[in-house]
């Protein structure tokens, strides 16, 4: 053994080839400070052994290296610039040391080689991957750029255009795509990875492969003619800004760094990368996006823990077909859990199967699936007009019409047809789980399972714990949602649960502005372009359906009359009474037609303005800051109330629910990250300015206490 540490081992193989193996004690290899120090020491040991003629890097895990240890980031990024600069320089000394070894080097890649893992393989002369490999630099998704030489080496290996596409998108690449652009040198079956890697290294040792020229290219300026460079970077800036927008600076910074470093050697190019990295690491966007990543890990960790308590789900059933039922059936079947789709009407079953087939066909067209896989998934969906195929299923998702009596009747009926230990859930967005549980003989095996529409796109599932729901029931539903590829958050029962409970105060703030004469299109523009929502409130209500919104609003008003009760007609009532339900009947706040791609196209409709003006009088203009304050303050305070009341367990889960369930702007991180960023005291002062607008604008006593103590919702790094 040449070197050994808890994360790395180096041994000598035949023909004087050293083998450096990453073998962390946890489930995956990642670059924390300890591993970087170990790699440095390992490389020193390798350099000192003059018998070594080549080096192979590999992993003892299912993945090569998944990246840097992001749990260290927030604390590190809070340090002074000089500390961050020193950390980057010390880490890059290690990667340079790997690149500068006096013999050929090769990475044998299995599974994920992402972020710092990708930067490791770029520092070697050759790269060979097996078919399980996924390679990429996802740092822009965290609001930063690669910091261990990724922006320097990748353009010199695969060309500037390809590197710009890889790094700005943050997507990981399949081995065939990586091979096509020259990021790797060969793709082999997993069992052939080691022998193929050793053969390639031996060819390099025998000078059949020119490793010195390859290495020299990585150390030199980019070989890109000046005019071509100008055109390439100008085009990239336009395309990337169109996708990333003004709220996400990291992708644009990547272009700037690669452009500036194009005429530089390695040392100077790395300094350019370091300076840009430090600048981005200090931004609120990076704090928010890293926070989302860490919150996502926390939520997934909870789901994994729930899996240990969960009842095994081998088969499922959804009651109620149609678009929603078809979406749930598709999601379950495509992730490997066979499902019965039961309805009382054949046309509804046809619609549900059609929805699943449509989604699968789209996957095949995009090259993400094959006709054979599509057939397998469709065969995993069993349509039924009676309960016979449902009786042996492990979990049932009731997804019939959103009406308490209908749901209660269906739940009582299905309980008579399933086994004693089958789990029963309701996909409801507003109806009390405790109320529905009264229709069951065994309420302990029942809870809510709220999917968001469209099911195949929306990552969140709210798992609603009723007062009688057992721990095993909740854990089993969480595990099933995870198996379906969803992110489950557990919430306690209350009107609207979590997501809808915090959404409708936002709509109330919007309605209040319209009652005071604001233009709904102007509000949408501010909330989309400035605050960063994917859709403004008027557009979102049109997409959700104003009939659905009107019903949910009534449920919320009944549940929280002191804050959400209405004294008169609002804009949602006006649209509902005029039978303007949104996209579903092509008229809501906006009017809709179908574009050339078959997608809904929205336009302004004079009738909407006439209806609103007749009810609320002449329009008047509002400043952007007031629009943001009057819509967001109610949502933020209601989110805090949910935490204080124990409806949601933690700020992390609340923020994930908002980002994944409502599209809360990721660069703001969620309500609690946003509060910490602007300061709780500043928010309280802002809310007090609008307190005269009613109960939705009244901050809680706990918020005032936190503000007085200069506190925060997340533990400060």
UniProtKB/Swiss-Prot annotation:
UniProt GO BP = fatty acid beta-oxidation
- Give the source's domain of life in one word: Bacteria
Q: Which reaction(s) does the protein catalyse, per the Swiss-Prot or TrEMBL entry? A: a (3S)-3-hydroxyacyl-CoA + NAD(+) = a 3-oxoacyl-CoA + NADH + H(+); a (3S)-3-hydroxyacyl-CoA = a (2E)-enoyl-CoA + H2O; a 4-saturated-(3S)-3-hydroxyacyl-CoA = a (3E)-enoyl-CoA + H2O; (3S)-3-hydroxybutanoyl-CoA = (3R)-3-hydroxybutanoyl-CoA
Q: Which keywords does this chain's UniProt record carry?
A: Fatty acid metabolism, Isomerase, Lipid degradation, Lipid metabolism, Lyase, Multifunctional enzyme, NAD, Oxidoreductase
Pathway-wise, it operates in: Lipid metabolism; fatty acid beta-oxidation
Is Coiled coil one of the keywords?
A: no
From the Swiss-Prot or TrEMBL record, give the protein name.
Fatty acid oxidation complex subunit alpha
Which GO cellular component terms, listed alphabetically, does the Swiss-Prot or TrEMBL entry include? fatty acid beta-oxidation multienzyme complex
Q: Which InterPro entries does this chain map to?
A: 3-OHacyl-CoA_DH_CS, 3-OHacyl-CoA_DH_NAD-bd, 3HC_DH_C, 6-PGluconate_DH-like_C_sf, ClpP/crotonase-like_dom_sf, Enoyl-CoA_hyd/isom_CS, Enoyl-CoA_hydra/iso, FA_oxidation_alpha_subunit
């Amino acid at each position: 053994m040449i070197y050994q540490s808890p994360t790395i081992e180096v041994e000598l193989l035949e023909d004087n080839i050293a083998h450096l193996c990453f073998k962390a004690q946890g489930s995956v290899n990642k670059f924390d400070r300890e591993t970087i120090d170990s790699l440095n020491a390992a490389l020193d040991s390798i350099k000192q052994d003059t018998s070594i003629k080549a080096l192979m890097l590999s992993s003892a895990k299912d993945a090569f290296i998944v990246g840097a240890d992001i749990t260290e980031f927030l604390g590190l990024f809070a340090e002074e610039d000089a500390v961050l600069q020193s950390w980057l320089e010390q880490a890059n000394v290690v990667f340079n040391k790997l690149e500068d070894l006096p013999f050929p080097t090769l990475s044998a890649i299995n599974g994920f080689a992402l972020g710092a893992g990708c930067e490791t393989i770029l520092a070697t002369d050759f790269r060979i991957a097996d078919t399980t490999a996924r390679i990429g630099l996802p740092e822009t998704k965290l609001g930063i750029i690669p910091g261990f030489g990724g922006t320097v080496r990748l353009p010199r290996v695969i060309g500037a255009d390809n590197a710009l596409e890889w790094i700005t998108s943050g997507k990981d690449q399949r081995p065939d795509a990586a091979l096509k652009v020259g990021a790797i040198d060969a793709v082999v079956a997993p069992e052939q990875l080691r022998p193929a890697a050793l053969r390639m290294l031996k060819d390099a040792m025998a000078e059949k492969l020119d490793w010195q020229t390859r290495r020299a290219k990585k150390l030199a300026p980019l070989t890109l003619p000046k005019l071509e460079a100008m055109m390439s970077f100008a085009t990239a800036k336009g395309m990337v800004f169109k996708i990333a927008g003004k709220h996400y600076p990291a992708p644009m910074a990547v272009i700037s760094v690669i452009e500036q470093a194009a005429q530089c050697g390695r040392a100077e190019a790395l300094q350019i990368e370091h300076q840009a990295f430090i600048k981005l690491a200090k931004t609120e966007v990076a704090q928010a996006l890293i926070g989302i990543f860490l919150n996502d890990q926390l939520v997934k960790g909870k789901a994994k823990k729930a899996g240990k308590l969960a009842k095994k789900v081998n088969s499922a059933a959804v009651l109620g077909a149609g678009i929603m039922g078809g979406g749930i059936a598709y999601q379950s079947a495509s992730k490997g859990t066979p499902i019965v789709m039961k309805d009382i009407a054949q046309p509804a079953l046809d619609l549900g199967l059609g929805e699943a087939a449509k989604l699968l066909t789209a996957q095949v067209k995009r090259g993400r699936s094959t006709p054979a896989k599509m057939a397998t998934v469709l065969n995993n969906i069993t349509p039924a007009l009676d309960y016979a195929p449902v009786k042996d299923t492990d979990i049932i998702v009731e997804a019939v019409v959103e009406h308490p009596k209908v749901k209660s009747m269906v739940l009582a009926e299905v309980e008579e047809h399933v086994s004693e230990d089958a789990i029963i859930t309701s996909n409801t967005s507003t109806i009390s789980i405790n109320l529905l549980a009264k229709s069951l003989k065994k309420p302990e095996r029942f809870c809510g399972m709220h999917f968001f529409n469209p099911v195949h796109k929306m990552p969140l599932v709210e798992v609603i714990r009723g007062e009688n729901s057992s721990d095993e029931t909740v854990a089993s539903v969480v595990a099933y949602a995870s198996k379906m590829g969803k992110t489950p958050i557990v919430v306690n029962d209350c009107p609207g649960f979590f997501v809808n409970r915090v959404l409708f105060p936002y709509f109330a703030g919007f309605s209040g502005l319209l009652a005071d004469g604001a233009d709904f299109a102007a509000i949408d523009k501010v909330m989309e372009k400035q605050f960063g929502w994917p859709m403004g409130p008027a557009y979102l209500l049109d997409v959700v359906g104003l009939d659905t919104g009107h019903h949910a609003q009534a449920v919320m008003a009944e549940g929280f009359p002191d804050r959400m009760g209405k004294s008169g007609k609002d804009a949602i009532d006006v649209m509902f009474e005029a039978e303007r339900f949104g996209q579903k009947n092509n008229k809501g706040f906006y009017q809709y037609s179908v574009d050339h791609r078959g997608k809904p196209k929205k336009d302004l409709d004079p009738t909407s303005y006439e209806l609103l003006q007749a009810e609320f009088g002449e329009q008047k203009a509002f400043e952007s800051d007031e629009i943001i304050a009057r819509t967001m303050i109610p949502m933020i305070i209601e989110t805090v109330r949910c935490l204080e009341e124990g409806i949601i367990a933690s700020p992390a889960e609340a923020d994930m629910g908002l980002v994944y369930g409502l599209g809360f702007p990721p660069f703001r991180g969620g309500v609690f990250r946003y509060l910490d960023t602007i300061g709780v005291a500043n928010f309280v002062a802002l809310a007090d300015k609008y307190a005269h607008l009613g109960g939705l604008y009244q901050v809680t006593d706990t918020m005032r206490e936190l503000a007085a103590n200069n506190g925060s919702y997340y533990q400060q790094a």
